[in-house]
UniProtKB/Swiss-Prot annotation:
A motif (Nuclear export signal) lies at residues 137-146. HAMAP family: INFV_NS1 (MF_04066). Residues 1-73 are annotated as: RNA-binding and homodimerization. Homodimer. Interacts with host TRIM25 (via coiled coil); this interaction specifically inhibits TRIM25 multimerization and TRIM25-mediated RIGI CARD ubiquitination. Interacts with human EIF2AK2/PKR, CPSF4, IVNS1ABP and PABPN1. It comes from Influenza A virus (strain A/Equine/Alaska/1/1991 H3N8). One of its GO terms (biological process) is symbiont-mediated suppression of host gene expression. It holds the Pfam family Flu_NS1. The dsRNA-binding region is required for suppression of RNA silencing. This is Non-structural protein 1. Residues 205-230 are annotated as: Disordered. Inhibits post-transcriptional processing of cellular pre-mRNA, by binding and inhibiting two cellular proteins that are required for the 3'-end processing of cellular pre-mRNAs: the 30 kDa cleavage and polyadenylation specificity factor/CPSF4 and the poly(A)-binding protein 2/PABPN1. In turn, unprocessed 3' end pre-mRNAs accumulate in the host nucleus and are no longer exported to the cytoplasm. Cellular protein synthesis is thereby shut off very early after virus infection. GO terms for molecular function: protein serine/threonine kinase inhibitor activity; RNA binding.
Length: 230
């Protein structure tokens, strides 16, 4: 096993522990707590894959971090912070919408890359909107936290979420997953729209009519299913 893989896991475990202690003091905001829960699942998956104990890895990670901090000057820390681009957390959904329970009459599930897509194919003749909570860096979608499909009545009929055991996904992964979700929901005469926020940061360039600029193959599959957010 590569030593960098092990040490990276150890440091991630310790930093998660520090963030958890911070959250236990009720100091974390909603985006912070979202990432904390997501990263916990990711660490469990990585630990299982690597065959490493999380508690032992956390102790080793603490030693690595302490050694780095002993060698770190205040000036070097300032330069490092200044060179790292800051990401922003954007929310289409409220906490209620993110945690809302839902069930599927005709369930369908598909995994594409590190993203899991779920939808209810029993939905008919509905106007559906896709909303997402995600982080943005350099004005592009960086990490998807959760995407859900809602009817006008507020019912959840579809979802895209990262797989805890397969961390990491790209902007293109998210767009491809959205294409799969829309393709599944378009049956039974449903109309699917993507929120303005998601359009803006997942697809930086748009057509004149406001529709996202899809790749040619994806565009052919979706051109009759997407309407811009009003």
């Amino acid at each position: 096993m590569d030593s960098n893989t092990v040490s990276s896991f150890q440091v991630d475990c310790f930093l998660w522990h520090v963030r958890k202690r911070f959250a236990d003091q009720e100091l974390g905001d909603a985006p912070f707590l979202d990432r904390l829960r997501r990263d916990q699942k990711s660490l469990k998956g990585r630990g299982s894959t690597l065959g490493l104990d999380i508690e032992t890895a956390t102790r080793a990670g603490k030693q690595i971090v302490e050694q780095i901090l002993e060698e770190e000057s205040d000036e070097a820390l300032k330069m490092t912070i200044a060179s790292v681009p800051a990401s922003r957390y954007l929310t289409d959904m409220t906490l209620d919408e993110m945690s809302r329970d839902w069930f599927m009459l005709m369930p369908k599930q598909k995994v594409t890359g590190s993203l899991c897509i779920r939808m209810d194919q029993a939905i008919m003749d509905k106007n559906i909107i896709l909303k997402a909570n995600f982080s943005v860096i350099f004005e592009r979608l960086e990490t998807l936290i959760l995407l859900r499909a809602f009817t006008e009545e507020g019912a959840v009929v579809g979802e895209i979420s990262p797989l805890p055991s397969l961390p990491g996904h790209t902007n293109e992964d998210v767009k491809n997953a959205i294409g799969v979700l829309i393709g599944g929901l378009k049956w039974n005469d449903n109309t699917v729209r993507i929120s303005e926020t998601l359009q803006r940061f997942a697809w930086r360039s748009s057509h004149e009519n406001g529709r996202p600029s899809f790749p040619p193959k994806q565009k052919r599959k979706m051109e009759r299913t997407i309407e811009p957010e009003v």
